[in-house]
Amino acid sequence: MVSTNIENRILDKIITSNFTKRELKVLLLIMRFSFGLNRDFAVFDKKDFFLAGILPYHVDDILKGLVVRGVIKWNPDKQMFGINKNLKEWIDRKQKADQF
């Protein structure tokens, strides 16, 4: 049986953060295709977020919001997505973040 290894400190931070349902689905999808394949980044098209039930017209807003808050790293040119492991850079929704 294969498993996805996620550091407890990352899970703890996700649990204690105020993410929307869509943001959580995006994070889980990125973790599955990065950590689940023993990689730091997942590589897939934005249309693949439909696997998590995210409609295409929501994807950009969700990704930009997570990038602005420092939760994910995103290279739009290469379609690479990764969880920012430096949890000190994460900004809670309650804190003010500069817009993308």
Name each model-derived stretch.
Residues 7, 23-27:
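Short, leucine-enriched amphipathic alpha-helices that occur as contiguous helical runs
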Residues 13-17, 22, 33-89:
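Winged helix-turn-helix DNA-binding recognition segment
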Residues 18, 25, 97-100:
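Surface-exposed, interaction-prone regions with an acidic/low-complexity signature
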Residues 1-14:
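Long, low-complexity, charged/polar intrinsically disordered regions in eukaryotic proteins
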Residues 1-3, 72, 94-95:
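Replication-associated primase and helicase/ATPase modules
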Residues 87-100:
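Short, amphipathic alpha-helical interaction segments positioned at domain boundaries
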